[in-house]
């Protein structure tokens, strides 16, 4: 058919004088990709290679052909190839990478963005630091100057604005997340609620003037109202200028084997046998599995069908299998998003066709609007406390030294407490015996694979009663809160700065090299740390630290740095953990009701929390059409079971029931209930 069409096109060209061009219909890159592409089509369309009524590209010629192949194919009309080349020469497109394309924030008339940011910051500074020291003002000024020089003023104003909108509209916002809590500007803008001075958090861990990269402020919102904040951003910056971000699910090793086996119409038992030979490890590949499992290697070498299955799977492994919308990512542009990136529709939602990594490389503003269930629990509990007790709590102003809260944590009674409710963490809290927020921060940072190895040393230091031995006295002010252990990335930066004289910006580069185990960089930095570089870094020896001590400190620091945690992030999560623990300790009924409401679609979790209520002496009342609500509710110090948590009863039916009861009074009998609800859901 194509041959007939081509002959007709040549004839039309000669009759009309319109020049010919030739093209190459390409669906895969290499000729040998024909079969894997055919298998991929089967996977995509739910067919097998044996199905006759399926989509296929027959002939194996739909690959990107070389210039020589194109000239050979169209040797009867060489001018067509020449014309195609002329068009290609006239086409020119270039992408500008790493150049910021931030949207502009509209400031009040007569003000500049820089001036407006300073105005808001200094107003916040005056409230948060009423008796401010000069050095604190200097830090704020340094941060503002750095932000201005790096071109991020609009970024901070944009984040400040939508967080202000959320708080003004009663949407609970988390205390912060990640390294942003190390910024005094973020704190003064109320983007974060963690005082960076109080917890020795470092600005350069968040924004490094010696390593230009986009700031990354991730924000947690009540998960039920997160979309309201996104909708506000869409209204403010324009629907065309805001889009959510695509994400791709790729074909992992086992999934690739199963999908390919299904497409090849292989017996299920054979495919299942091969897939189970692949170790269930994070990041496992088929190639690694062949080296690790001799049975798999033997099957590959001896069984023809298995060889075909694995060879084809190797070609498809890692390719995108499906696309979806990123759970939190939103891109905001100064012009319509389509001016910068291609778009696609997914269930009515406009998405970028580029992933967030590429968007960042293109200099576009990516924000993460995260929904955190725990914040919804806190907000629901606070509202219930106000309804029942008439007390309006401000969760940002809780006393941090509440012995009742720490007693509960030390006993491991942390079911439902953010970050502290796993069995292992409960046991750790019983061993750690935290008595302040610093202990909780360290606990969250330590309880991870890798750092867990240092837990015994940390607990030993904590119990030593101030008798911790330091390799050099200059380490004491840096490590005293963690009893001589390097727990945080910020401590690595402080050691490099205070002992060897690095700038904080450069110390962050060293920290990054350590965490990524860059041997060549580390060998170079080791010499600079100990002896200096004769220019910017004086080194430990010049600062009065013996060579042996400097070598030992660097080696220990390198070992710890592989696992060191971001203290800013741990501090934010410790605050949320403390808030939930405080609510559980002081208002257990309201807290447990809110907690169960947040998981009422998960029967197993509800059951677990019911058991916790029994241990706490909280009585659970059965569901009642005259007393109950959609959510778990508090009544006379007891918890009423949620109507919407009853299996096979929809939320719409519950809402209709409650609305009818509130409008016309309680139901007096089953007959009354049936008559009044007849025709409803």
Question: Where do the protein language model's features map onto the residues?
Answer:
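Metal-cofactor-binding active-site regions of metalloenzymes
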Residues: 1, 98, 102
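Extended catalytic cores of very large enzyme megasubunits
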Residues: 90, 107-108
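Charged catalytic cores and adjacent phosphate/nucleic-acid-binding surfaces used
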Residues: 1-93, 142, 157-210
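Noncatalytic, beta-rich nucleic-acid-contacting surfaces in large DNA/RNA-processing enzymes
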Residues: 28, 60-61, 102, 108-681
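A structural signal for short, well-ordered beta-strand segments and their strand-loop junctions
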Residues: 19-23, 96, 244, 419
